[in-house]
């Protein structure tokens, strides 16, 4: 079962990750000459049906309202699994939900690699159970283990860290959410 699968993954002979998205290029969306800063928040048990950004009638995202014009809300998303170990690597994989093979993230590039290759600085900030091999090749900051701190820790020195990245940047905030 699971032990045999883990041994197969670890014993693979790939030393360099299998490349994906080699033809990807950065095309600026905004024509203002300023660097792009994207922040992607991923986390646990955030029920889309309860987000006012997605049309829920209660005001559940009040603090984000001043920024609503600058946000992209991904409404048509489906999880690849019910565990972080499966859903997180699948989310960043080029394979897609139907073709994703758990364990392939160990030896295959992902979305973060593509961003880095197209000139983005990539930073993964974490207060959850680890990046599940998504952040192996990018800068990573882990704030606590075993759910010992709240999600707001991910904002510690956020502006300074974002400014220090200089140029186009992607910051992933992997929150523990409502564990």
Question: Language-model features: where?
Answer:
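Active-site-proximal alpha/beta segments of enzymes that process anionic O-linked groups
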Residues: 1-40, 45-179
């Amino acid at each position: 079962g699971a032990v045999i699968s883990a041994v197969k993954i670890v014993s693979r002979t790939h030393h360099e990750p299998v490349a994906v998205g080699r033809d990807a290029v950065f095309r600026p969306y905004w024509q203002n000459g300023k660097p792009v800063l994207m922040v992607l928040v991923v986390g646990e048990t955030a029920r889309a049906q309860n987000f006012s950004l997605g049309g829920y009638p209660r005001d559940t995202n009040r603090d984000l309202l001043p920024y609503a014009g600058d946000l992209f809300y991904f409404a048509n998303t489906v999880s690849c699994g019910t565990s972080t170990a499966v859903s997180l690597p699948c989310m960043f994989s080029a394979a897609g939900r139907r073709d994703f093979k758990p364990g392939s993230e160990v030896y295959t590039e992902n979305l973060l690699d593509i961003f880095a290759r197209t000139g983005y600085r990539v930073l993964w900030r974490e207060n959850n159970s680890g990046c599940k091999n998504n952040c192996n090749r990018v800068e990573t900051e882990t704030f606590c283990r075993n759910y010992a701190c709240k999600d707001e820790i991910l904002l510690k020195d956020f502006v300074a860290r974002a400014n220090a990245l200089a140029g186009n940047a992607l910051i992933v905030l992997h929150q523990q959410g409502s564990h």
